[in-house]
């Protein structure tokens, strides 16, 4: 067991800095009591209290974060290998950890350990160069044909597989040099993006794979450098390598599961899912699907005060919308009988007791590491009192069941956490059968074990709870899943906290849980995002254990544009219209112009739009004075109305204040002039006005990208602008909710649920990426 550090934080920062951690990493480490204690012990074992080489120190730090808890008796040996430079390094350290985890209960076979983990194996630069040369010669014809479009990553992977203990940097440098020698520097053709395939390819997954029915492909080539997320290559252990307290536990588990991967997505039904949950779904469902396993949708419904059927239904709908298919929908509440019996068994084994302290007394005791005065009751007394709790003989808060861990433990989660509390509330699934409900810390791990979960994947804030998770399962003698934590998804310009979202809704800062300015999946759906776009974001960012990483909202928008570009039918809309009269076009004439549904996909067909003597253009597409950077219309200037005719401005009509009210133009039906600037427009049948619709232009809800503690004062007052009477062409007629369009030169829009038979309503999903350049040209 780790001991509590006996030196203060400043001294710890100094100690950790002496082994090579930078100051910020050293300070961050001291905030994690378990990691800090582990690292302090390892430094002592290594004899590095006065410092060491940075390369050694970083290996010791990695050891503190990753060393398997079941193999503590071998830790000092591995520390000695590192401290005395016995050929354990960053290349083979993970192999060492994996070996010790598998053989934790055995005496260390040094020869087998060193052979299995590459200890003492040295791959020279010359060996790397020879392996690269052999590969290049073997694949020379393909390389010469495809040049820099050849999968260079495949070369690196194959060389690494053949030279397992080689330095990855050496491999990369030798491959780069060999490719340059064979092909020479990149030409302009080499730098061009590869041709798009006829059918989209499945994105390369990092520890997961997209579970939606379709995918948009790999975004890597088009992501700007400043938006590229840091991915980590994650390799989870096989179910058969999951060390248990007894071989029988593992054998029984493997017999039940057939050795397959079993994961779960376990939301609490106390609100609507947000985009952070999309990442959790993507990892859990995707990892199981990729490996031929299964994933449960499990509701952790242990708090009846905050849960209701509306949230359950919404969560099921969101999971299906994202394309995930749970093997079964389960509820922690369906295990209440089993959990109750396990609690009694916990009492019988001396690991739980009924406590009557108040919440503040419990908090103080855990902080000061002092025992509850009720901690040493007899088993018989605790069993009777727990039964009295179940029978409703206590008021809420007057009695709780606590797990008897270790009140002196440096990890606060081991200090007698609550297992059961009294709540006289109706439960959406179990009704009024129970008045005692298990806590998350008690329920989560036990239901994982009951459902034979192989990989319990949680966000990093639960890392501190891993010790309690394993402890509770072990003292009850149950099967123990692998627990692995990853960084949660953080997104700029928005909040993902359920508490904060509730505040926004209740204070009517937004219009409900599906307001398009929120981060809920319902909100993104209403805003027009597709499940494929959200899954593409999850696939693009992958998984990482680096906490505090925030993903730019722009990357999400990039994923959305990438997906909608090939799906959204084009239409034209004018938000701030100027009337344009084509003076040489017959007054009573109307015609229909053919326009492509999706210009890049001719197979998607065309649609017809009305054209007559009166058309409308955007006010921002006209200027009294022209310049070379302006794409729009000006006096005496000729431009092209997209898909229609060239027009030339002959006359400008203004009101008393100088505001332009009407333009008179002439058109060239033969479009004699070529390569003119092009603008969008809207018209209608002669003698009628174009269709009108309400358009809602959404911006970020918060002014700053990083949302601080003063978040309510950071609300963007201009996060919603409504265009009540925009002109839109007839393409959108007969549309239904969630139908998506690209309004040409403007952005992507979706039909909102507020649409009626009298008036359509559109929400802006995302602007076109060229909007920034366009706005510059109009200034």
Swiss-Prot record:
GO terms for molecular function: ATP binding; glutamine-tRNA ligase activity. It catalyses: tRNA(Gln) + L-glutamine + ATP = L-glutaminyl-tRNA(Gln) + AMP + diphosphate. The keyword Manganese does not apply. GO terms for cellular component: cytoplasm; cytosol. ATP binds at residues 268-270, 274-280, 459, 488-489, 496-498. Belongs to the class-I aminoacyl-tRNA synthetase family. This is Probable glutamine--tRNA ligase. It comes from Dictyostelium discoideum (Social amoeba). The lineage of its organism: Eukaryota, Amoebozoa, Evosea, Eumycetozoa, Dictyostelia.
């Amino acid at each position: 067991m780790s001991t509590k550090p006996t030196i203060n934080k400043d001294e710890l920062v100094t100690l950790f800095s002496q082994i090579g951690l930078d100051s910020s990493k050293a300070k961050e480490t001291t905030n994690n009591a378990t990691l800090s204690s582990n690292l302090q012990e390892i430094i002592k074992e290594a004899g590095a209290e006065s410092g060491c080489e940075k390369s050694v120190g970083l290996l010791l730090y990695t050891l503190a974060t990753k060393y398997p808890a079941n193999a503590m008796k071998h830790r000092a040996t591995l520390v000695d290998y590192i401290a005395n430079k016995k050929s354990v390094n960053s290349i083979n350290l993970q192999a060492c950890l994996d070996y010790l985890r598998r053989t934790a209960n055995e005496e260390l076979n040094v020869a087998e350990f060193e052979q299995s983990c590459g200890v003492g194996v040295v791959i020279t630069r010359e060996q790397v160069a020879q392996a690269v040369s052999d590969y290049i010669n073997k694949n020379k014809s393909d390389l010469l044909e495809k040049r820099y479009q050849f999968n260079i990553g495949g070369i690196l992977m194959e060389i690494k597989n053949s030279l397992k203990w080689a330095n990855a940097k050496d491999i990369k440098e030798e491959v780069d040099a060999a490719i340059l020698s064979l092909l020479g520097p990149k030409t302009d053709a080499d730098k061009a993006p590869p041709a798009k395939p006829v059918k989209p390819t499945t994105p390369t997954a990092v520890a997961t794979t997209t579970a939606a029915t379709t995918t948009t492909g790999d975004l890597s080539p088009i992501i700007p450098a400043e938006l590229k997320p840091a991915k980590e290559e994650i390799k989870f252990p096989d179910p058969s390598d999951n060390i248990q307290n007894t071989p029988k536990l593992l054998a029984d588990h493997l017999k039940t599961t057939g050795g397959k991967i079993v994961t779960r997505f376990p939301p609490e039904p106390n609100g609507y899912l947000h985009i952070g949950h999309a990442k959790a779904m993507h990892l859990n469902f995707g990892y199981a699907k990729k490996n031929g396993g299964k994933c449960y949708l499990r509701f952790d419904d242990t708090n009846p005060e905050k849960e209701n059927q509306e949230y359950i239904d919404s969560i099921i709908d969101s999971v299906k919308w994202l394309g995930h298919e749970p093997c079964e929908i389960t509820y922690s509440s369906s295990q209440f009988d089993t959990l109750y019996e396990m609690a009694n068994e916990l009492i019988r084994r001396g690991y739980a007791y009924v406590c009557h302290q108040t919440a503040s007394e419990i908090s103080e005791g855990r902080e000061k590491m002092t025992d509850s005065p009720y901690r040493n009751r007899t088993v018989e007394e605790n069993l009777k009192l727990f039964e009295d709790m179940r029978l409703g003989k206590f008021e809420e808060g007057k009695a709780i069941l606590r797990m008897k861990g270790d009140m002196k433990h440096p990890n606060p989660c081991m200090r007698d956490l609550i297992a059961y509390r009294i709540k006289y509330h109706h439960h959406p699934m179990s009704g009024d059968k129970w008045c005692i409900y298990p806590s998350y810390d008690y329920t989560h791990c036990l239901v994982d074990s009951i459902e034979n979960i192989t990989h319990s994947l949680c966000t990093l804030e639960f890392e501190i709870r891993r010790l309690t998770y394993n402890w509770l399962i072990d003292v009850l003698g149950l099967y123990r899943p692998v627990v692995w934590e990853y960084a949660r998804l953080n997104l700029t310009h928005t909040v993902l906290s359920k508490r904060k979202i509730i505040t926004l809704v209740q204070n009517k800062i937004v219009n409900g849980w599906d307001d398009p300015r929120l981060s809920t999946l319902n909100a993104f759906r209403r805003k027009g995002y597709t499940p494929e776009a959200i899954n593409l974001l999850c696939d693009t960012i992958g998984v990482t254990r680096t906490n505090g990483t925030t993903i730019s909202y722009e990357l999400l928008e990039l994923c959305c544009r990438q997906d909608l570009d090939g799906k959204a039918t084009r239409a034209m809309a004018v938000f701030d219209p100027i009337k344009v009269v084509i003076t040489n076009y017959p007054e009573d004439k109307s015609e229909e112009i053919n326009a492509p549904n999706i210009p890049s996909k001719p197979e998607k067909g065309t649609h017809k739009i009305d054209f007559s003597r009166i058309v409308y253009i955007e006010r921002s597409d006209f200027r009294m004075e022209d310049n070379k950077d302006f794409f729009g219309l000006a006096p005496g200037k000729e431009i092209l109305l997209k898909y229609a005719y060239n027009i030339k401005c002959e006359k400008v009509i203004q009101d008393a204040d100088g505001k332009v009210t009407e333009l008179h133009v002439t058109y060239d039906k033969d479009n004699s002039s070529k390569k003119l600037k092009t603008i969008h427009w809207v018209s209608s049948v002669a003698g009628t006005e174009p269709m009108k619709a309400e358009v809602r232009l959404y911006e970020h809800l918060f002014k700053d990208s990083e949302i601080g503690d003063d978040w309510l004062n950071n609300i963007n007052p201009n996060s919603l602008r409504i265009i009540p009477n925009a002109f839109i062409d007839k393409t959108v007629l007969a549309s239904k909710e969630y139908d998506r369009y690209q309004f040409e030169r403007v952005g992507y829009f979706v039909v909102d649920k507020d649409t009626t038979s009298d008036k359509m309503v559109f929400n802006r999903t995302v602007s076109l990426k060229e909007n920034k350049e366009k706005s510059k040209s109009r200034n």
